[in-house]
Amino acid sequence: MSALVIALPSKGRLKEQTEAWLQDSGLRLEIDGGARGYSANLKGLPGVEVRLLSASDIATALDAGDVHLGVTGEDVIRERGGDVDARVMLLRALGFGRADLVVAAPQSWIDVDSMADVEDVAHLYLARTGQRLRVATKYGVQTRAFFSRQGVVDYRIVDSAGATEGAPAAGVAELIVDITTTGATLAANNLKIVPDGVILRSEAQLAASLTAAWPDETLIAARRLMRIVEGRGRAKGLSSLRWPAEFDGPARRATKSFLDHGAVRRSDGLLVPAHDMFDAAEALADAGVGPVSVDRPDYVFEASSPVIEALAARLGQGKASETASASA
């Protein structure tokens, strides 16, 4: 059997958040060789090989087809350049590892409030000094693409090997493009975010390689994983209401309107979006239905996984998707 190879972060906050997400989904990461190992398996999910890599190495491995799935920031995936969407498919945003890729200018540039202003400054700088405005960044691919879309041409990239936010103060650049979460570090270095200079609002993504080899059994394992994480994610937004069987008629009439807002009938009750739970309970009480119990489900599984079906279609493996549906 061909194993499903998943790359996960090997260190830092992203590693901790990824492990917490897996554990919340009922999957425990077991690292081979102790805490310093670089391979692992997922307890409860056979047929899966886990590789622990840096965030940037995960993006590289996905792009090259060395792994099937990976968890890393969208910012490092996008930095692979070219038509990356033809090589890597984003399956699920994970809700952590959030950061913005932004253009930041010195706070002393009080008249710079837009990328159009940046272009004006760059043009004047070139006319005055004969040199292009220097932009320090580790994200050259996305910077060039964004500046092109914004019509900024009179600049040059300075590759940043260290703390990018210190480049203007050090005299090695006039502007920077960097990742920020709160903007506090930029402010501490007397920099401001250009209001329309947000290049990407990034977060951790579960992504799939479109260049890897995907035999049917590998797609089946991926479908099993997605069923688990989707089932857990779906359950977090739902509440389950149950009532005595003898009240089923009036209960169904009382909750009919909720079906138009994401509620789903069950043989013994109703699944409703969590934010509608109190309204649904009140509607049942007004109809004389009771007692009504409310639970939060651990998982809510659907008959199919649209994400894996979309992946199979991108891979040209519609038949593999059918095989997975029959076998999982």
Question: Can you name each region flagged by the protein language model?
Answer:
Residues I58, H68-T72:
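Conserved, well-structured functional cores that handle cations and Mg-NTP chemistry
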Residues V103:
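Periplasmic solute-binding protein
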Residues S2-G47, L52, V71-D100, W109-E119, ...:
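Small-molecule-sensing regulatory modules
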Residues A64-D66, V172:
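Alpha-helix C-terminal capping/helix-to-coil transition sites in glycosyltransferase folds
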Residues A59-T60, P168:
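Short alpha-helical basic/polar micro-motif
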Residues R51-S56, D63:
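N-terminal low-complexity or amphipathic/hydrophobic leaders
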Residues H123-L124:
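Short, hydrophobic/aliphatic alpha-helical segments
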